C-alpha cells in the first residue's frame, strides 16, 4: 500500500514558519533598511530563483550568515518572506506599488502576477497612464497591455486628467499614435495634443513632433481652416505648415491623397 497525506506539506510549512518566528534553525538573516529578517535558505530558494541562485551558486552570499538586500522596503521583504512560508500575502492599494517591485527583483513570480492582476482591476481614467508606466518599468507586460487598452478606450476621459498632462514626450507620442484611440473625431486628438503642448512653455518646441501624430486629414475642412490654419504656433512652423497643407489637399484632391487617408484613418470609431 502506498500512503499519501496531502496534509503533510501544509503541516511542514506551518512548523517551519513557527521555527522561523522563534528564530530556530534559521541559517540566513536578511538585512534590509537596518532591520534583520531571519529565514531558512531552503524555503527561500524553493520559492525564488533569485535566492536559489544566491544560495547555490558561487556568490559570496552563499556562505554569509547575514545577507544585505538593497532597493527593497523592509515591509515588502517581510511580506514576501511570510508568503514563502504561508502562501498568503495581503495586497492593497497602500502596499502594491512597493510589493510588486520587490517581488519582481526577488523573483516571486506568483506574487508579481497577483499584484499585476490587482492593479488591472483598479484601472480607471485617473490612474491608467501611471499604471502603464509602472508596468513598463517592472516588466509586467500583461498589465501594460491592459492599461494601454483602457487608456485608448476611455481617451475622452483620460485626456482631461492630470496624468495626461504629465506624460513625457515619448509617452504622449506613443499615446497619440495609437490606432485604437476611441474618439468621436480626430479633432479631439488635436485638442488634446494642444493642451499637452501648452501645459508647459518649453513644450512648444516639440510642436511638429506631436502634431505629426495627429491625423489632420481626418479633421473637417472647417476645423482645419479655423483651428489649425489660424493657430500661430502652427503657421510659424514650416514643418507643421507642410502637415496642414497636406491635410487641406486631402480635402481638395481626395483622389490624389488616398494613401494618406487610408494609412491614417483606422482609429475612428
Predicted regions and their residues:
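Eukaryotic intrinsically disordered and solvent-exposed regulatory patches
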Residues: 13-17, 24, 66-67, 85-86, ...
Amino acid at each position: 500500500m502506498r500512503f499519501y497525506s496531502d496534509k503533510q506539506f501544509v503541516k511542514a510549512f506551518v512548523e517551519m514558519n513557527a521555527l522561523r518566528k522563534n528564530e530556530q534553525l534559521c541559517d540566513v538573516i536578511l538585512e534590509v533598511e537596518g532591520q534583520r529578517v531571519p529565514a531558512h535558505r531552503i524555503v527561500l530558494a524553493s520559492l525564488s530563483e533569485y535566492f536559489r541562485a544566491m544560495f547555490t551558486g558561487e556568490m559570496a552570499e552563499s556562505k554569509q550568515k547575514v545577507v544585505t538586500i538593497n532597493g527593497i522596503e523592509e515591509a515588502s521583504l517581510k511580506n514576501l518572506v511570510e508568503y514563502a512560508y504561508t502562501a498568503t500575502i495581503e495586497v492593497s492599494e497602500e502596499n502594491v506599488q512597493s510589493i510588486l517591485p520587490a517581488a519582481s527583483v526577488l523573483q516571486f513570480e506568483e506574487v508579481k502576477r497577483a499584484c499585476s492582476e490587482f492593479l488591472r482591476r483598479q484601472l480607471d481614467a485617473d490612474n491608467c497612464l501611471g499604471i502603464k508606466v509602472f508596468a513598463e518599468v517592472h516588466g509586467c507586460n500583461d498589465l501594460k497591455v491592459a492599461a494601454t487598452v483602457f487608456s485608448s478606450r476611455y481617451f475622452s476621459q483620460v485626456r482631461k486628467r492630470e496624468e495626461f498632462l504629465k506624460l513625457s514626450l515619448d509617452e504622449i507620442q506613443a499615446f497619440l499614435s495609437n490606432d485604437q484611440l476611441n474618439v468621436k473625431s480626430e479633432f479631439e486628438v488635436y485638442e488634446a495634443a494642444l493642451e499637452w503642448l501648452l501645459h508647459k512653455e518649453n513644450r512648444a518646441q516639440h510642436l511638429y513632433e506631436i502634431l505629426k501624430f495627429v491625423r489632420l486629414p481626418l479633421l473637417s475642412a472647417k476645423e482645419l481652416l479655423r483651428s489649425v490654419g489660424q493657430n500661430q504656433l502652427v503657421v510659424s512652423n514650416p514643418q507643421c505648415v507642410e502637415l496642414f497643407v497636406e491635410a487641406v489637399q486631402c480635402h481638395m484632391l481626395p483622389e490624389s491623397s488616398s494613401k494618406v487617408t487610408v494609412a491614417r484613418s483606422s482609429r475612428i470609431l
